[in-house]
A protein has these predicted regions:
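Internal, hydrophobic cores of structured domains that mediate oligomerization or house catalytic pockets
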Residues: 68-195
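Mixed-charge (acidic/basic) macromolecular-recognition segments
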Residues: 140-257
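A surface-exposed partner-binding patch
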Residues: 1-111, 212-332
Length: 332
């Protein structure tokens, strides 16, 4: 949905978007989200072109800036606008990445407050990354990644790439006026300092197949390690094999439900997230995921996430994720 640039900075529009998101998703939009909107409002034609050249386009919840009262198409739920098949309920899309279904979302563990930014490629098997605290950090990383990749071509005197580097510099200058201005590194040096670093083990989260981890305490059937401590390949292979066995998947679901109704929803949450990630269009797995996530979020006091999960379950077979009434055009 095309958004006139000045609407990102319009106080009335911003307030209306915040109210709508709070009413529909239950999420309190963070200050960093509105700094991202300020950044978009500050872009001139050259900087807008540079953003497009990065493959980045505001999307999902950002479409509400065009019309905060926009309604979904008949019979659909607005909470699935921009919600891709494997998006966990904690993920709210705000930016499309242009290639292989790359998209970025605000991440909320409790469905009320934002806890950073997540991203992943919906068209491949990679997991979700949660290495950026804010939307502008995510954009800055893309700028520096592009500069790193263009540097060799520009060094050879390629005029088109030199022009792109100049445009990237102007885009960076606008962004650093809002955030990350203290980070003086650019290109490869920036990536090495802020992007390539392996994050520490997060003992507050439990390992999940989607790569994002689940914020929950309690016991799990496999005694799963904390987020960041597992061998990702071994864990993923084991879980894929388990879930491919219909009897084993059913038994795992039954045990998770038993634990949840006994007061420990940890297994229901992590297994529900795993099944959601690895449903692959299998109706039985989709149903198990929906059932487990519903009970887990209810027991954890996360009703907004329970509602998002239920809405997504109803609409996971949609051929596309553009559900607002005005026609949208986005790459798959």
């Amino acid at each position: 949905m095309a958004v006139e640039t000045e609407r990102y900075g319009d106080p009335e529009v911003r307030e209306a978007v915040a109210r709508r998101v709070g009413a529909e998703w239950g999420l309190e939009l963070p200050d960093s989200f509105f700094r991202f909107a300020d950044f978009l409002a500050a872009l001139g034609p050259v900087e807008q072109r540079a953003l497009r050249d990065l493959g980045l386009a505001p999307y999902g919840v950002m479409d509400l800036f065009a019309d905060p009262s926009a309604l979904p198409r008949e019979g659909l739920d607005i909470r699935v606008h921009g919600r891709y098949y494997r998006d966990p309920p904690e993920f709210l899309t705000f930016l499309h990445g242009g290639t292989d279904g790359l998209h970025f979302g605000l991440w909320s563990d409790d469905g009320r407050l934002c806890d950073g930014v997540a991203s992943y490629y919906t068209n491949d098997g990679d997991g979700i990354e949660r290495c950026h605290r804010t939307p502008l950090e995510a954009v800055r990383a893309r700028i520096e990644g592009a500069e790193r990749d263009l540097a060799d071509y520009a060094a050879d005197g390629d005029e088109a790439e030199l022009a792109r580097l100049t445009d990237l510099g102007r885009l960076r200058a606008v962004l650093t006026g809002f955030e990350t201005g203290e980070r003086t590194e650019t290109g490869l040096a920036y990536s090495e300092a802020y992007v390539y670093r392996r994050p520490p083990v997060d003992t507050a989260r439990i390992t999940t197949m989607d790569g994002a981890g689940a914020l929950v305490t309690g016991a799990t059937v496999l005694d799963r390690p904390p987020h960041g401590a597992a061998d990702v390949h071994r864990f993923g292979t084991f879980m894929e094999d388990l879930l491919d066995d219909a009897d084993a998947a059913r038994a795992a679901r039954d045990e998770a439900l038993r634990r949840a109704v006994s007061g420990d929803p940890a297994e229901a949450l992590v297994l529900g997230r795993d099944l959601h990630r690895a449903s692959y269009g299998r109706a039985e797995h989709e149903a198990y995921a929906s059932e487990l996530l519903a009970v887990a979020y209810r027991e954890l006091g996360r009703p907004a996430l329970a509602e998002v999960a239920a809405a997504h379950h109803r609409h996971r077979a949609l051929p596309d994720v553009d559900v607002l009434r005005r026609a949208l055009s986005r790459p798959a």
